Amino acid sequence: METRKIPAREDVAAQDKWAIEDLFATDDAWREALAAAKEFIPRVTAFRGHLAESGETLLRFFRLDDEISLAFDPIVHYAQRRSDEDTRVAAYQEMVAQVTRFAVELQSAAAFETPELLAIDDETLNRLYAEAPELENYRLCIDRVRRRREHVLSDKEEAILAAAGEMAASPDDIY
């Protein structure tokens, strides 16, 4: 039986590697994107207590959520792929840890979302849909949240749970 070794990354042909530079050209560009993403936190918290004010407000909140996803996904994937390239490189493990910390901050900032959506009665929700017809694009998301009504914690309890995210990820991030 022949024993084969896994080649070192530098010995793998370029066409067989991830095109990580398609996400960010350099680690510094990734750091800049992560720093810029932190500006989302005050934008999210500005919606606290306001989701039911108008259809337009709720629509702007969901659009911000979309914007965050589009900006944050490449940041997450870059850090994870860099870490996967060579798990011995502490700098890339730290990048994953930074992403995890930021995700926890963002989840904590948005912890009000579910309790506020659940607090909207059906009549008000119908009014919000009428005020902003584009909210229909988010109906499935809203319905999924509202269906879990019996299993959702209060605003403060959701924030505590979100803050525990970094601790829960710790076993995966030890390096």
Regions found by a protein language model. Name each.
Residues M1-Y175:
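A well-structured
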